[in-house]
Each structure stands twice: as C-alpha cells, then as structure tokens.
Amino acid sequence: MSADIVDIGHTGWMPSVQSLSILLVPGALVLVILYLCERQCNDLMGAPPPGPWGLPFLGYLPFLDARAPHKSLQKLAKRYGGIFELKMGRVPTVVLSDAALVRDFFRRDVMTGRAPLYLTHGIMGGFGIICAQEDIWRHARRETIDWLKALGMTRRPGELRARLERRIARGVDECVRLFDTEAKKSCASEVNPLPALHHSLGNIINDLVFGITYKRDDPDWLYLQRLQEEGVKLIGVSGVVNFLPWLRHLPANVRNIRFLLEGKAKTHAIYDRIVEACGQRLKEKQKVFKELQEQKRLQRQLEKEQLRQSKEADPSQEQSEADEDDEESDEEDTYEPECILEHFLAVRDTDSQLYCDDQLRHLLADLFGAGVDTSLATLRWFLLYLAREQRCQRRLHELLLPLGPSPTLEELEPLAYLRACISETMRIRSVVPLGIPHGCKENFVVGDYFIKGGSMIVCSEWAIHMDPVAFPEPEEFRPERFLTADGAYQAPPQFIPFSSGYRMCPGEEMARMILTLFTGRILRRFHLELPSGTEVDMAGESGITLTPTPHMLRFTKLPAVEMRHAPDGAVVQD
C-alpha cells in the first residue's frame, strides 16, 4: 500500500488527506484571487445586479418552468426586486420587473442592440427589424414608422386616418359575418373564434403590408396561417437552443429547426412572387398616374393660352388670383403608395444592403408577424374574458347598443370603459410576457449596478402587470383599474403593453385602431358566453406569445337596429 493511495481491493482508489491538501490549497488560492479581483472590479465599476446562482454552463435554465418561464421570473422578481441578473446558459441576462426601470433602460442607445440569441437571430440573419440592429435596424424602423403614418396611422382626424379606418373596417366586418355564419351552422351557436379572427385580421395586415388579400381557401394563405401558428409555438419550445446551441442536435430540436427553416424558405418564395406582382402593379399605377398628370398639365396649358388670348382681345381684364397661382398649380403631385411594400419598392436603392432582397423578405415577415401575432392573441383573450365576465359585458352592451350596427372609431374611442376593458385584457394576459429581448451593446453602469456588454436585457411585462402593489388582486379582471373616479380613462404608470424606448412597438396607434374596431363591432353585434359546463385553462400556452388554449364561445346575435335603455334598465328598440 502506498503512502498516498489507499487500495480498496480492485474497486478503485481514494486520495489521501495529504493529496487532497496539495490539490485544494492551490484551488482555494485561485478562488480567493478571483473573489478579490471581482471585489476590486465591483468597487471600480459597480456590482452586478443581485440574482440567483446557476449551474456551470447551464446557468439558471434548469430551474425555469419551460411551459411558463414568465412565472418563474416573476417569482425571482418578488425575491430580488425590480432588477436582477441570472445566467441563461452562458448568456448574462438582466431582468427588469419595474416599469420605471424599463423606461430608464430602454431610452438609452446602449440598450438598442439585439439579444445574443443563437436560434432566432441565426434564422433571421440580422435582417428585418425585430432581430436587426445598428444601421439596418435604425433605417428599417424609421422607414416603417414613416410608411405607417403615410397609410393613416395618426391620432389626428382627417381623410388619411379615415381611409385607414375603412380598410381596417372591411376586415372587421368580414369577421363579424364569419362569426354569424358559423354560429348559424351550430345548433348551440358555438364557434371557435380563432379561424375567423386569424383570417380577417391577417387579411387586414396583408392589405396594409402587401396590398393584397386572400380568400379563405387559398393554399398559400392556409399554409402561411399554419406556419405562423406552429412557428410561434416551436420557437418557444426550442427556445433553450438559443442559449445552449449544442442542443440543436437533439432529434426533437432537429425536427423543429428543420420545420422553421423550411417554412422560412417557402415563405420567402411566396413573398418573392408577391414582390414581383406588386412591382408590376406599382409600375402600372405610376404609368397611369403620370398619364393623368400629363393630361392635367396639358389642360392647364390650354386654359392659360385661352386666358392669354382673352386678355389680348380685352386688355382691361383684371388679373385674377388664379393667374398668380399658375406657377404653383403646375407643381405635380407624386403617386402615393398604397401599402408598405409599394413604399419600399418606390424608394428602393438596389445597391444598398438596406434595401437588399434578404432585408425586404425579413422585413415583410417581421411586419406581418408583429401585426398579426400580438393583436390576434389580445383579441382572443378579450373575447374569452368578456364571455367569462358577464358584468363587464353587460356594461359594454349598454354603451354599444345605442350605436348603429357598425360603430366608427369616432363613436367608439370616447367610450372609456371599452378602452379600459381592452387595457385590462392586455394587463392580465400580457401577450408578450417577457417582451422582445434587447441587447446591451457595451459595458454600462446604471445607478449602483454594472451591466456587462453583450448581456441580454429582458422586460418582464408579466411581473410588472401582475404586481399586486400596482394592481391589487391581479388575477381579477377589473377594467375599473383604468378609470378615474369620474369615469375617464387613465392608464397606471406600471402599464407598458407596447414596451418603451427606442425599440418599442412602432405600430402602437394602428394596433389601438384595430383592437378598438374589432372589440367594439363584435360586442355591438353579439352576446358572448362560454358553452354550458365549459372550463377554460386561463394560464394559456407559451411561445413567442401567450395565447389562450383552444376553446369555443357561444355567439348570440344582438339586434342590428339602434337600441336605447329605459330608466328602469330595460332595453327599448328605437
């Protein structure tokens, strides 16, 4: 037997106390040195935010609920406060669960980077708007906002906004008709609201982004809807690959990633056909527009010549104001594109990466997905909660029944209670519960904390909106949280459904218009109920968005004529 090794038969060996000392002392010295270096760094630059320990290489990932990661982070927020840090794999992640901190962080340019996510950014390649950064992101965001405003996304009343409202209303009215048709087919008037909502809302976004709409049975449209529904779930299921890329080799993840990549390729092929057709339409429209402008120019020249000849024949004629404005009237208007794709093609510089084919394809996908995913999930939650909360629905009917069967934004927007119901839906079920992750572009000190460059910054909207201090009994659906004592709408400062800062949703106002028209017109035409004996799991399904589990609703049609309420509360037909 050696002095250093204890022989335990043929089963192995154990180091002696002396050997362990030789190994442990240098290791302890290394740990002490690392600790002192960290303390020195913290003294100079600030300490990192507090947070839980994780496992080597895995970080805190094993302790997150894969089905509801937003709830796991909510529990940590209760322990550590409005800001804490953990490791997602090897990615340092700062989680914000206080609205004031979110606004403070996201107003800074250093926080406008993209999060270091392997899967989503690998698929997107740094193009589009959601996963882009620096020049590509800035240009895409600026142009997108300008184009949306040109389509009518403004709070200012006028023809431009009215034109956008009419385009949205066509899709809303189609949805109402589909609900009516499906309810008549069912003996109990029970309808799955998802297909009608997805088709009609999707076609609104198709019209605004691509300048086209689809029939319900169009093969391309059916495929795009299926891809969107499955893709939103799969990216959530495979999300751990973002932090542990080697997991992409597991069979389940191989299948998921293959589905996403094949879906991307097929989607881009469909988009290429749409772009080509739109380009041809744009050329034809511009040609017709130029011909009309030329006719107007020739007509003005003819009128000028006739006026000149008339003056020569009668010099005593006085010069009119129209004569003075002749030069101004000769200025030709330019053709105004009718969708985002037309705007892109009209200003495209084919030599710039900002307008390359990859950027166009990914931008179109981002705008379509962002336009549909969040609004669709919000509408589904809204209808489900109103079917559960009959008190709230009755109050809405009292406000909506005196209006015509298709109320306008001008009629709906003053209804503070309707807006409060929409806001309460977005609070109680944040459809993007962890927001869109940001990336910290460089080392950054805020307050007493040091944020390492390359960190992922997460806005925990779920924790913010479910904070019992800001929203007592947060699981209770109470639209009154958004009303003042005199009934006016007022959003609490902790309410941030569209995030904040430079990367906040660029289509916020358009989303409000869409949600207001859908909710107002659907509730004006139908009474909603859950089928008898039905229980719906209100926890929802987590992916990129938080969506309701599949469910049916009972749609009972309300009178199309305007109704008023008698003093005793009875409904009276006008």
UniProtKB/Swiss-Prot annotation:
The pathway this protein participates in, as annotated, is: Steroid biosynthesis; ecdysteroid biosynthesis
Q: Name one GO cellular component term.
A: intracellular membrane-bounded organelle
Kindly list the biological process annotations in GO that this record carries. Answer: border follicle cell migration; ecdysone biosynthetic process; embryonic development via the syncytial blastoderm; oogenesis; organic acid metabolic process; xenobiotic metabolic process
InterPro entries, per this entry? Answer: Cyt_P450, Cyt_P450_CS, Cyt_P450_E_grp-I, Cyt_P450_sf, Cytochrome_P450_fam2
Task: Kindly state the tissue distribution recorded for this protein.
Answer: First seen at the early (syncytial) blastoderm stage 4. During cellularization of the blastoderm (stage 5), stripes of expression appear and remain through to stage 10. Expression becomes undetectable during germ band retraction (stages 11-14). By stage 15, some expression resumes in the primordium of the ring gland, so that by stage 17 strong expression is seen, but only in the ring gland. This specific localization continues throughout the larval instars (at protein level). Expressed in the prothoracic gland cells of the larval ring gland (RG).
Q: Where, subcellularly, is it found?
A: Endoplasmic reticulum membrane; Microsome membrane
TM annotation in the entry = none
Extent of Acidic residues compositional bias: 320-333
E.C. code: 1.14.15.-
Which residues of this UniProt protein bind heme? 505
Upon changing residue 399 to F, the result is: In strain: CN13X
GO molecular function (one): ecdysteroid 25-hydroxylase activity
Q: Which reaction does it catalyse?
A: 2,22,25-trideoxyecdysone + 2 reduced [adrenodoxin] + O2 + 2 H(+) = 2,22-dideoxyecdysone + 2 oxidized [adrenodoxin] + H2O
Q: Which UniProt keywords apply?
A: Endoplasmic reticulum, Heme, Iron, Membrane, Metal-binding, Microsome, Monooxygenase, Oxidoreductase
Task: List, alphabetically, the PROSITE patterns matched.
Answer: CYTOCHROME_P450
Q: How does it sit in the membrane?
A: Peripheral membrane protein
Q: What does this protein do?
A: Involved in the metabolism of insect hormones; responsible for ecdysteroid C25-hydroxylase activity. May be involved in the breakdown of synthetic insecticides.
Report the sequence similarity comment from the record.
Belongs to the cytochrome P450 family.
* More info: Member of the Halloween gene group.
Task: List the protein's name.
Answer: Cytochrome P450 306a1
The organism named in the record is Drosophila melanogaster (Fruit fly)
